[in-house]
Curated annotation (Swiss-Prot):
It comes from Haemophilus influenzae (strain ATCC 51907 / DSM 11121 / KW20 / Rd). Its EC number is 4.2.1.33. InterPro entries: 3-IsopropMal_deHydase_ssu, Aconitase/3IPM_dehydase_swvl, AconitaseA/IPMdHydase_ssu_swvl, IPMI_Swivel, LeuD. This is 3-isopropylmalate dehydratase small subunit. SUPFAM superfamilies: LeuD/IlvD-like (SSF52016). The lineage of its organism: Bacteria, Pseudomonadati, Pseudomonadota, Gammaproteobacteria, Pasteurellales. The keyword Manganese does not apply. Pfam families: Aconitase_C. PANTHER family: 3-ISOPROPYLMALATE DEHYDRATASE SMALL SUBUNIT, 3-ISOPROPYLMALATE DEHYDRATASE SMALL SUBUNIT 2-RELATED-RELATED. CDD domains: IPMI_Swivel (cd01577). Heterodimer of LeuC and LeuD. It catalyses: (2R,3S)-3-isopropylmalate = (2S)-2-isopropylmalate. GO terms for molecular function: 3-isopropylmalate dehydratase activity. Gene3D superfamilies: Aconitase, domain 4.
Amino acid sequence: MAGFKQLSGLVVPLDAANVDTDAIIPKQFLQAITRIGFGKHLFHEWRYLDVEGTKPNPEFVLNYPQYQGATILLARKNLGCGSSREHAPWALADYGFKVMIAPSFADIFYNNSLNNHMLPIRLSEEEVEEIFQWVWANEGKQIHVDLEAMTVTVGDKVYTFELDEFRRHCLLNGLDNIGLTLQHEDKISAYEKNIPAFLR
């Protein structure tokens, strides 16, 4: 898994608070157990006018032409509330989002996002409002996220954010739970060679 250090990208301004995981990925699309293929169902009930998902809703922000190819999602407080389904960050990541910015995230969704190599950034409500205003006024312009410096640069303004150092280390180095375990492969192998035969 590639490490995450910096990203410059377009921002989708999702002007809504308390966006729950059922809105992010509705329950009828949860049958699959792999992480791929969920992006086409992201925000399905908001994004499409029909059940089949063939008629895009032109009034939903994700369908606006100027936000196609965006890699950063901007939202209001309590993003990812509701059920604990891990499919929600799967859908966001499969669509192409790498960073989410909001005043707050539901705890389980926040951790699931980090576990799936996405960066959820908490900023104050005032800072998030400033970014919304900038995005609306600067159509087509990118913002810059620097995980090493822990900053978000929006136009000529720089915002700082916090992240647990262990989580930051994992993102910077592209490490998931398996990758972390494999860092100790030599020690694991040495231990296995020395345990009694009846325990093997």
